[in-house]
C-alpha cells in the first residue's frame, strides 16, 4: 500500500511538471534595468496579472504552471512590451533596440515566424510605395 501511495505521489509530481512554463529573458535595453515586468493574460476584457519579475542586469525570469495554451503579454507598468504564447515548456525572450524575439516552444516559434514574415511584407510594401512615389515625381506614372 505504501509503494502505491509513493508511486501515485511521484506520478502526480511528474504530471504537474508537464504543464509548467519557464520564461527566461535577456535585454540590452538600458531603460528596462531595475524595472518590473508583468506577465498578463486577457480575461473578460481585462488584463489579469499572472506573474511579475524584476529586470536585473538585463535578465528576467517568469515561472509557473499553465493548464492550457493561452495568449499572454509582457508589460512594463501599463505599456505592452510584447505578446507571446503561454504554453508549457522553456520559453526564451530576447529584447533589444532593434527586435523582440520569443522562441523555444512550438507555438511561439510559429508566432514569431509569422511576425518575421509580416515584417518582410511590410518592408516590401514600403519599398513599392517609395518606388511609386519616385515614378510620380519623375513623371513616369
Language-model region placement:
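Bacterial Sec-dependent N-terminal signal peptides
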Residues: 1-27
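A non-transmembrane, solvent-exposed segment enriched in polar/low-complexity residues
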Residues: 17-141
Amino acid at each position: 500500500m505504501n509503494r502505491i501511495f509513493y508511486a501515485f505521489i511521484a506520478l502526480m509530481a511528474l504530471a504537474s511538471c508537464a504543464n509548467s512554463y519557464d520564461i527566461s529573458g535577456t535585454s540590452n535595453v538600458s531603460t528596462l534595468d531595475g524595472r518590473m515586468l508583468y506577465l498578463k493574460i486577457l480575461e473578460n476584457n481585462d488584463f489579469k496579472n499572472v506573474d511579475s519579475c524584476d529586470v536585473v542586469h538585463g535578465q528576467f525570469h517568469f515561472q509557473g504552471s499553465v493548464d492550457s495554451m493561452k495568449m499572454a503579454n509582457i508589460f512594463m507598468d501599463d505599456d505592452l512590451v510584447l505578446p507571446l504564447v503561454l504554453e508549457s515548456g522553456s520559453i526564451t525572450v530576447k529584447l533589444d533596440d532593434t527586435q523582440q524575439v520569443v522562441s523555444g516552444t512550438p507555438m511561439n516559434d510559429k508566432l514569431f515566424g509569422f511576425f518575421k514574415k509580416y515584417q518582410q511584407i511590410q518592408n516590401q510594401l514600403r519599398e513599392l510605395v517609395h518606388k511609386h512615389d519616385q515614378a510620380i515625381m519623375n513623371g513616369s506614372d
